[in-house]
Structures are given as C-alpha cells and as structure tokens.
Amino acid sequence: VSLPLIDAHVALAGYADLWVALVLGLALLAWARWLLFREPRQWLLAVLLVACLPAIKLEGAIWLLAFVAVALLERLPRRWRWVLPGGVVLLLAVILGADLLGVPLPSVGKVHIGWGRIDIAGVASYTLKWHAVGGPMLASLYELPNWHLLWYLLPALIVWRWRDVCRSEAARLLGLFVLLQLAALFVLFFLTSASAWAEDFTSVNRLILQVVPGVLVFVAVLLRDPASANEKPVRETDLPGLRKPATRG
C-alpha cells in the first residue's frame, strides 16, 4: 500500500487502473488459496472476479485470457502440460502465417492478429515493429520514485527462494501468470506505437500497476514458512460440480 504510484492513484478520480489492480489482486489471492489448499469456494471466487475484469477496462480482457490460459494449464494432467501448449503454439503460428486469426474479446470486439499488425475492432490498429524504449522502461522501474525497492528485490527473492519456486506448483503457476503479463506489456511498448507512452512516462506505470498484484501474490507464496507449505495435490473431484456421489459398500 505504501508504493508511491498506488498512493497517487488513490488520490486520482477517473482512472480505472487501480480498480483493475484491486479486482485482479483479489482474484489471484483466491486462486492462490485454491492452488495451496484446494478450497473450491476460492476457485469459484477467483473465476467470478476475473470475469469482471473486461467490464472495468480494456486491459482486463487481456488479463482474463492470460488467467484462463494458466488455469487451464493447471487443470491438465502433468504429462500433457507441455505437449498440448506446444501444439497450440504451433497451430497459432500456422494460423498467423495464413493471416486468419481473429479473437473475440468480451466488451471489446473482435481482435484480428496477423504478422506485423494487430487490429482491435472499434478501438485501434497497431503496426508491429521494434521500438527502442528500454531506457525509459528501466527508468520507470528502477530510477523514478514509483515502486520503492519492489523491482530490485523481486529478482533477489527469486534467486534466494529458487528451490521453493521449483517445488511449489502454486509459485510456478503464479510466476507464469506474471510472465504472461510482462510479455503482453513487452509487445505493447516495444513493438507498437504505444512506445510513446513509455518515452513520455505517461501510461507506462499505470499499466505496470496492473502487474503488481500478481507480483505481490507470487512474493507472498514464496515467503511462506517452508514448514507450513503443505500444498494439497489436485484431484479430479476437487472442483465444484465434479464431486463423485458417495456409494454404499
């Protein structure tokens, strides 16, 4: 709560970024409890909260898709977790090559993605090309007084708790979600005309603000006492509606 940029947004009226961050943070906290303790009501709460994101702001639809992708990966049997995603990536590459990919996003419309461009119906069209905005991005994260020591401490914490990252499925999945968020921001700022937002330091930190909840939940999972790290294994009957009826023996 003491992060300077969050304090600034609390005092500003009309910006939805803080609300996106709040709802996403609550969803990820609920999902983390599902991953750690297999509480079905927390899984339902996470799904309901994430489903609200597109109604708040355009970026919410992107985070919804990222969450769905990671949540589906978590539900796959372990032997399929890399085979199936690899097949999906290959299929997407073929579709992109044929310039056929159109994705409907809630409250946004159809998004057409092809090599070299992204067209969002009724919103904008982006031509994909490299923009060298590494300097402003690093300044936003490390030099300007926006995030205290958050982005300095995160890499150090990952190195310190690397064994926990390898052992904890919850940490790995939350980390994957954060990586998908960072990848989306990389494409936006380094490959589209939105790079101007990074160069003049306007919207870049407002979008980074939406990544912070995932980072903080990931950090909280890593900092758990190893002695209390009793993650429950997933079972097919854990999710609501999938419980098998009791049988008399």
Where are the regions that the model predicts?
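Transmembrane alpha-helix segments characteristic
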Residues: 1-2, 48-50, 167-194
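Multi-pass, polyprenyl lipid-linked donor-dependent membrane glycosyltransferases
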Residues: 6-26, 56
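Hydrophobic, aromatic-rich transmembrane alpha-helices
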Residues: 72, 133-175
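Specific aromatic-rich, kink-prone transmembrane helix
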Residues: 19-36, 49, 214
